[in-house]
Amino acid sequence: SAINNGYKDVHVDIKISDGSPVNVKNVIEGEASIAMISGSTAFEAWNSQIGTESSYDGKKLCALGACYPECSQWIAFRESGLHYVNELKGKSISAGVDASVTEAASRAVFETLKIDEINTELFGLGLRESADALREGKIDSAHSFYTAPFEAFEVLAGEREIVLLEYREEELESILRRNPSWCRIVIPAGQYPGQEKDIVTFGQKVLLCTSTEMDEETAYGIAKALDQMAAEYTGGHRFMASMQDKD
């Protein structure tokens, strides 16, 4: 990893977790030294918005760096004739599993575009289930709030011509006002087979976080390693290329 190779005073062991909310709790309570946490979850933790039973102090959460973005991606087959997200009203679409980050993003989109279960057929499918449903013709479009390219969507794009649906500028501005942790993100042309132009969407940064209990020297060493080893860390991972963006 970038940290192990760039900062010899520490060694990082990787463990699979149950998601950002659990990672927040583990970091603050000392069960984990560092963890990957989505920007929106970190924001909610800092503002004590994660659950009414949380006993930890969200102000103890500290970000060491932004590692990669995850963003809103609506995919459809080119033959559908769809071009914009606002054309999904009246269609059959997958909005993500209940309480997932994809579902939360879908909800903000639907509120902006006046889409609901009355005027549109909505399915709460997981990301890979959504891709399968689109392939089988059960839905017209699938939504992913994840890294780009998302593997299951990339496989679809290799099988049939796809389009990434676009947001209009005023729609993006309205969506971004709903969540201060979201930002404008560009999916570069060529991320998916057949994607001919950049797609402007919204998303969030995934942060490497620790607690304020970590000593300053160690925190600085880890952050410095992330910066200096960015080129090595992003090698072969297109969605992590933004780590090298100094802006």
Task: Describe the predicted segments one by one.
Residues 1-44, 53:
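N-terminal (or domain-start) structured segment
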Residues 1-6, 10-13, 66, 70-136, ...:
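Bilobed "Venus flytrap"/periplasmic-binding protein-like clamshell domains
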Residues 197-247:
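Segments of small-molecule ligand-sensing domains
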Residues 54-67, 191-200:
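A structural signal for short loop-to-beta-strand junctions that line the ligand-binding cleft
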Residues 1-13, 28, 59, 231-247:
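N-terminal hydrophobic or amphipathic helices and topogenic motifs
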Residues 39, 49-50, 80, 116-215:
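Pocket-lining segment of extracytoplasmic ligand-binding domains
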Residues 7-9, 19-22, 29-32, 58-59, ...:
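Extracytoplasmic
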Residues 4-8, 28-32, 47, 79, ...:
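Sec-exported extracytoplasmic/periplasmic mature domains
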